[in-house]
Amino acid sequence: MKIHLVHAHPEPKSFTASMRDVIIETLEAQGHSVTLSDLYAMKFNPVASPEDFGERRDPDHLTYALEQRHNWKQGTIAPDIASEIEKVLAADTLGFTFPLHWFGTPAILKGWIERVFISGPFYGGKRVYGEGGLKGKRAFTAFALGGRPHMFGDGSIHGPLESGMMKHFFQGTLGYIGVDVVAPFIAWHVPYISDDARKQMLDDLAEYVRTLDDQPLLEMPDISNFNDRFEPR
């Protein structure tokens, strides 16, 4: 199996970096092939701009998604974007490691998504959710935060993470492009716990990765329940 891992943390010695390393070591020990985009180490440019396109469909007015589609077909999309797209398309499984920032991904990862998950091969028209461009692939996530488990979930102060604060990522991004979204591994309260507790988390993460095939999937909209205009049937 081919896995492409996207890592977003500016500190090479961070706990999130340790999670990245555990994931790679565990997958490779199972015989899988792993590629990595370490966004800070790469100095990846997260800013979408007109410079992303070598041949403008409309030189007078930038409609970013339409230019993405046009330039992908023409082979004129920026090389740094094209390289990342090829890594994603070549993978069977995508993985993401990051710290939670304001109940979302770090800005550099959000920018990577905006520039790399392009209209055309990833989504477009009725090609979303179960019919999305990456149908048949799957994605998993391991992220760290300072909060405790009791702060999240039904009836908690913040509500659920996967179907609440981070629905924009799990459904609005990963699910939208058609991948099967594995329930995430969450490292809780990381800055405030003991070294032994953090080590146990890394052991738990290794087990999560080893048993990835058995992890539950997050529920996504069933496109068959909607007509061609996405109205409920």
Model region roles, listed by residue range:
Residues E131-G136:
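Short, conserved loop/helix-junction motifs that constitute active-site signature segments
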Residues A8-P10, A144, M151:
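Glycine-rich His-Gly loop
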Residues T93, R138-F140:
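Conserved catalytic-site loops of classical short-chain dehydrogenases/reductases
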Residues G124-V128:
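A gly/proline- and charged-residue-enriched helix-loop-helix capping module
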Residues F152, I157-R233:
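Glycine-rich phosphate/pyrophosphate-binding loop and the adjoining helix
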